[in-house]
Amino acid sequence: MKLTRQQFLKALPASVLLLAGCSASETAPASTEELVFDHACPLDYATQFTADCYEGGYTMLTLTDSGELFLVTPEDAAEVEGLPESVTVLRQPIRNIYLVSTSVMDLFLALDGLDSVTLSGTRAEGWYLDEARAAMEAGRIAYAGKYSAPDYEKILAANCGLAIENTMIYHTPEAKEQLERFGIPVLVERSSYESGPLARLEWLKFWGILLGKEELAEQEFARQVERLAPLAEQAPTGKRCAFFSITANNLANVRKGGDYVAQMIEMAGGDYVFADLTDNGNNLSTMNLPLEDFYAGAKDADVLLYNSTIEGVVHTTEELVAKCSLLAEFKAVQSGSVWCTTQSFFQQSMALVDFVLDLHRVFTEDDPADLQFLRKVE
């Protein structure tokens, strides 16, 4: 049985509990003589993890939804006795990581942590991050199978210290269980379940703790937040915007109103046309609309953003209209205000602020050039 963070803390022996500089009115994790609570890592946006810091450099990372616990332990620190079996101990430095969750790679790059990854769940040609692709082509990172079919022999031979998965692994739980039977810790990261872009970006602190680069993570996160500060002082542009793609079965795939892409449109000063679309009983951030409903909601949008991730890049208006003839009647198509995301966008987790700044230029400039993640559909 998995223990929650609260259950873990309650399970520590009462005979050795100590208070570590906290007043009686504060709610803080209990401490033991071997694991003495110091402080909780402050998080401004993220809700899918917590980090409790203990004396001696120990940090307990908790995945809030699953309740999974990971005790990050400094290289030369003593082993903590009496931990519940549900706590996974990760002793630094964590080497030979099997990285399956592609959104994590860009955060590792920002922390200069690429050398800790030696196994990938994505082939070289599947990476849009130049450094990751180059590392695979040079043989510094090897392909070790996708999430549902790990190459156990290769993973074991590499002396893998940690497998980093996303929640897709829950579709094939036997793969996760087999890795754990081989003694390989499995961490299922949940950054994609954060509702906002800055909450996703704040996972930089999670990986900074894991890699022993907390200060760098704090500095980089603060720098990214600061870059957005000028936009908060500006009035909304009034530009209405849709973010979509046309599926193979003639539906419009759009983001729900609470999704982080919708929030980025708002942060950039725009109005997301499907802001009222809410959760329809699943945890997906997208939903498919009949073309008639999409037409009704987005026909008068000032800006159209085409999502290239699944259905591919659209270069021209002719290509776009070939996917859906109704689009020829859209205001943004007729005015030439249609943009397509680059295919690298969803792997570049550190680029969320850049994307917001790109959007702001689209909303405020007549014909912005040299955007990082948007290309004009001519």
Language-model-derived ranges and their functions:
Residues Y152-M168, I184, L291-L304:
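Proline-aspartate-enriched helix->loop->beta-strand connector
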Residues C22-M105, L216-F243, D367-E378:
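Bacterial Sec-exported substrate-binding components of ABC uptake systems
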Residues R5-L9:
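N-terminal export leaders
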Residues Q234-H315:
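Flexible, glycine-rich surface segments
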